[in-house]
């Protein structure tokens, strides 16, 4: 499926599917850090990868990739800016740790594991398609480098890519807390998702 050929109806359907998954993911993150976290309604866009990289590329982030296995394969990428990553790690282990440390990386992998599992479970129930997480891997780099690698690993080599992005918000202030959640389906997975909910 050429992403540039997706109709408004198809994009809206993907947004609704992602919204259900994102709500469960926000609940999982809230429970982990003991603070209410909201998420924006997912943005589902067909855009040029170079445009995402140009817009966000220079931000240093901790990025954790969870490969999605099963009927609708792809990648989930959880991104936190460094201060947020450090706060989450400290909240969970009780001491300051760098996201680049072994302990910090391990904590972020566990956070990604729980959040992505919540996201996958809700989508799997909605679509009746099997999804399972792989072992997460965390890296610390410029956001542009992490995004490019993740999209290419999802076999999204084309000029246009499908970007399903959700932003974490502080429930008290409604401000972006510096966290982003991307679901990047492999070629062929989109058709299965749309077909399962009666959209062709």
Q: Where are the predicted features?
A:
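Composition-driven recognition of glycine/serine/threonine/acidic- and proline-rich low-complexity segments
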Residues: 2-18, 22-24, 30-200
């Amino acid at each position: 499926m050429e992403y540039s050929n997706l109709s408004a109806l198809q994009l809206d359907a993907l947004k609704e599917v992602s919204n259900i998954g994102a709500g469960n993911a926000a609940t999982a993150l809230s429970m982990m850090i003991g603070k209410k976290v909201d998420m924006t309604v997912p943005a589902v866009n067909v855009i040029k990868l170079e445009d995402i990289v140009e817009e966000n590329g220079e931000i240093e982030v901790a990025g954790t990739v969870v490969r999605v296995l099963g009927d609708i394969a792809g990648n989930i990428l959880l991104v936190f800016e460094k201060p947020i990553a450090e706060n989450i790690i400290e909240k969970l282990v009780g001491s300051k740790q760098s996201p680049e440390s072994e302990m910090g990386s391990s904590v972020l992998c566990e956070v990604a594991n729980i959040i992505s599992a919540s996201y996958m479970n809700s989508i799997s129930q909605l679509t009746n398609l099997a999804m399972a997480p792989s072992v997460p891997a965390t890296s610390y780099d410029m956001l542009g480098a992490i995004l490019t690698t993740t999209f290419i690993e999802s076999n999204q080599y084309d000029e246009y890519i499908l970007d399903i992005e959700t932003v974490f918000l502080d429930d008290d202030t409604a401000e972006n807390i510096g966290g982003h959640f991307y679901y990047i389906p492999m070629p062929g997975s989109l058709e299965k998702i749309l077909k399962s909910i009666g959209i062709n």
